[in-house]
Amino acid sequence: MALLVWSSLVVASLHLLGTAAYPSRSKYTVINENCPGAEWNIMCRDCCEYDQVECACPDGNQKVGYTIPCCRNEENECDSCLIHPGCSIFENCKSCNNGSWGGTLDDFYIKGSYCSECRMGWYGGDCMRCGEVIQAARGEIMLESYPFNARCEWSIQVAPGYTVELRFGMLSLEFDYMCQYDYLEVRDGDNVDAKILKRFCGNQRPLSLRSTGNSLHLLFQSDGSKNFDGFYVTFEEVTGCSSTPCFHDGTCIADKTGSYRCACLAGYTGRHCENVIEEKSCKDPGAPMNGYRKLPDGAGLSLANHIKVGFKIHYFCNNSYVLSGNQERACLQGAQWSGKQPVCIKACKEPKVADLVRQKVLPSLVQSRETPLHQLYSASFTKEKTDILPTKKPALPPGELPPGYQHLHTQLQYDCVSPFYRRTGSSRRTCLKTGKWSGRAPSCIPICGKLENFNITQLGEQRWPWQAALYRRSNGVKDASLRKGSWVLVCSGALLNERTVVMAAHCVTDLGKSSIIKVSDMKVVLGKFYRDDDREEKSQQHLHISAVIVNPNYDPILLDSDIAVIKLLDKARVSDYVQPVCLTLATEMITSPQEYTIVISGWKILSDPRAPGSKNETIRAGAIEPVDSLQCEQQYEENGISVSVTESMFCAKQEPRPSPSICPSETGGITTVLLPSPTSPEGSWHLIGLVSWGYDKSCRKDLYTGYTKVVTFKEWLEKNMK
């Protein structure tokens, strides 16, 4: 007890430890063997006295001790040279070092190595030091017991963007309502000047607390009386979302400042999604007449026919009906539906329109139909009682149709955009109750055989818009005036439609063979009038060939079935100078040739460009008259030539008037006839023949020429024209 009193008296003089000094004699300038050690020499006077203090180590009450050297003071009294707190230095030791009892080298106090192991939270040789700066994501701080007048500071720092959460595992400090004796103080920052979050004392474990930044400062302070077990805390770096602050399955979203916000599910609100929104719904508007509606999964159609806010209804119509209005409606927050309720209207989808067809929607008109029943009522009853109207078009239902649809009974009118085309199919079509259109789909095809201002006496000046010129490359042609690879006019044919030309088969095959010449070595020219190839004509169209189809019965020896179809790679542009010729039906074949005008036309194949007037030479034409096949065979036999005129051929001779400018053996060409037409008062021209064979040199008008009878191949031609 006396030892503890002494200790409390001398604590106030601890500052003398490093500054107290006394005059000493010269004999003490070296080690004085009478003192505990060399460290005491400068503090000793004439004589050195010492006494031994006995203490107990807290671990097992092990006896420990140390020596306090003393000196005589001015009054010759024994006075402590070094003031020491006594046994309190051992209180924080977990295990103690033991000195030499009474020995001269007992130097615990000078060396400061009283303890070999410290209690938790303490360190140093005397286990009196505590506190540190901690930079870690998580950890713990424990202070196991504590002495009087202790002061410890800890600074906890975690990564930027995080906050520090502090949790208490144990608290045992002297209790005071104001916590002004023994306490643990927590500040929101990294130093003692930061804002105080809380001061703790007593033994009731506090709730956890959290910093606003990435650091906390802890200060422990004890006074000079009473000591307890200390405290134990853990810390961890956290984000605002670590504590799962969002209720009702809300999603926590952290930001860089350590704060957070909650993304709430539908039906919840508040900072933590803690408020439940009163669920609203919309009354089911039902499906439109002649239609139906679809609800998405989870729309929540209740027994009371209500649909949850946020869901949409999609509307559809039955066949032959079209939706007018909103295709979908959404249930809004105010329990109201977006848009207006749609209706299903009888309508027809506009039919597809072919090329060159012009479609026009006719204005709404009353359509009248009188049935036999109308006549019966009109005849049987008086006018006053039977004012019966004919059937008529009903009023249009309300609502607009989407683009591409027309109301019931709407009429569409069709015509062609070009005067060179004629319409096939219906001129008008009506929208029916079935949702389909009446009539047949219209299309526009080129007008065939149209030739205006024809004059039989002026054949040399006439243009034949269906005349097609076939050119071949000059490879292998023995003509010095032609360079290799240049184009040579070889035959004439006729344009049947925008992609088809008919030609004699011997023009597109190797001489005396059925093998077809490469299409890359041939081309077709339309709109041609002058023979000279160097004479530029704006009306000309030079077209590549995609395929050549020779009649399968073609005989290159007898020239039987001498006919072929040329398919054009690109469409021919129909104009005043380029038009197709008509094909003749078998029933339209000429029975009385003298009653009709039959013309052969073509260009002279072999032409001398040096001859006078060659630049102005045009297509040649002349009238012909068919003759009997036997008569034709007999004439050739009389001229020493044996020929056979088959059913696919016919023979003809030139008429003397008007004077012809053509020689079939030099030009080849096509034969056309002018027949009456129900659509044109001028008639229309029909293809009846292709020049096939004849005399090789003589051009006498009485000599016969063999032609391919085109009407025989009408079905084959139409099949390959598609």
Swiss-Prot record:
Pfam families cross-referenced by the UniProt entry: CUB (PF00431), EGF (PF00008), Sushi (PF00084), Trypsin (PF00089)
UniProt keyword Glycoprotein present: yes
Glycosylated residues in this chain: N98, N318, N455, N616
Signal peptide from the UniProt entry: 1-21
Domain of life: Eukaryota
Domain annotation Sushi: ranges: 280-346, 393-446
Cited InterPro entries: CUB_dom, EGF-like_Ca-bd_dom, EGF-like_dom, Peptidase_S1_PA, Peptidase_S1_PA_chymotrypsin, Serine_Protease_S1-Domain, Sperma_CUB_dom_sf, Sushi/SCR/CCP_sf
GO-annotated molecular function: calcium ion binding
Peptidase S1 domain: residues covered: 447-722
Protein keywords: Disulfide bond, EGF-like domain, Glycoprotein, Repeat, Secreted, Serine protease homolog, Signal, Sushi
Assigned protein family: Belongs to the peptidase S1 family.
Role summary: May play a role in regeneration of skeletal muscle.
Span of domain EGF-like: 237-274
Paired cysteines (S-S): C130-C152, C179-C201, C241-C252, C246-C262, C264-C273, C282-C331, C317-C344, C416-C444, C491-C507, C632-C651, C663-C699
GO CC field: extracellular region
All residue ranges annotated as the CUB domain in the record: 130-238
Localisation per UniProt entry: Secreted
Name recorded for this polypeptide: Inactive serine protease PAMR1
Biological source species: Xenopus tropicalis (Western clawed frog)
Presence of the UniProt keyword Disulfide bond in the record: yes
